[in-house]
Amino acid sequence: MKPSIILFLFISFLPKCFSQKQVTSVQQIWLGNTSQLRFSNHWGFAFDLQVRSRENFFQGISQVSSRIGAVYYLNESVRIGAGYYFADNIPRDYRKAVFQDEHTGWQQISWSNKMPRLNINQSFRLEERFRHRIINETKLGKGYNFNYRTRYNILFNIGLARKPFTPHTLAAVFYNEVYLNFGKQIVYNTFDQLRAFGGFNYTITKNANLQFGYLYSFQQLAVGNRYRNLHAVRIFYLYNLDLRKKKTTNTKAMHDVSYSGNKLNHLNNARFLAVNHHFNAKYI
């Protein structure tokens, strides 16, 4: 746990290591739904949907994105996944409403450590990004730019109630995520961005949670001397459903058999006592 905390603190101050020559700041609202369905002991399905506003919180939409994929559970703590991500967004270097489509393949491994009052979740993701080329502020070009991107995320979920992580209770949530670009078309911004989030998680039911708080993002743009600060209100609905059949049928059947056996034993004992009483009354 100590190395994770050190890393968490280290990357929180990472932006100070960069020379911020031209910095722009924006304020947005991020809304999202993250769902995960588990079909069996090893297989599941993941689906995400996100909407982000433009600058100053309410000036239109800057991005709509969705992600789907298959999930394989190695065990209850480790899982791997792969799938497809699509985004339609207004490029950050342009102010006019030209939307740039992005098609991305992704592969991920995630693992968790659960304690009575603290859950730590970590993940590492590899992405293959195809983004539509842009000619100018109002027109897309032909073809796509391509690059790889890696993402490492560490999240701390701290229960605040007497019975943490139960329905109608709050937990504090903190996470950091580091993004790195690489590929032939990456010249200046190998470091892509850092995201830091602080907020709360409200457990609605055992399957549903509402996560809300403040998100800060520091990003280096494709032009090497340009940086971007993002301040966002982030509100996500999280839904996890386990569709595996519970082991209640066998337990109930065993209970029924045991109950029937006990009932039969009581009946036999009653019959024996009746016969014995009749014999004693007749011959004694």
What are these regions (language model features)?
Residues 125-209, 218:
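Outer-membrane beta-barrel transmembrane domain signature
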Residues 45-47, 78-82, 118-124, 150, ...:
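Transmembrane beta-strands of outer-membrane beta-barrel proteins
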Residues 41-42, 77, 114-121, 160-170, ...:
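Short loop/turn motifs that connect adjacent beta-strands in outer-membrane beta-barrel proteins
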Residues 21-83, 87-90:
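Start-of-domain marker
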Residues 49-55, 84-90, 113-115, 126-130, ...:
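Transmembrane beta-strands of outer-membrane beta-barrel pores
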Residues 109, 229-283:
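Outer-membrane beta-barrel "beta-signal"
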Residues 33-37, 68-72, 107-111, 152-162, ...:
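Residues on the lipid-exposed face of transmembrane beta-strands in outer-membrane beta-barrel proteins
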Residues 25-29, 62-64, 101-105, 144-152, ...:
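Residues that define the transmembrane beta-barrel architecture of outer-membrane proteins
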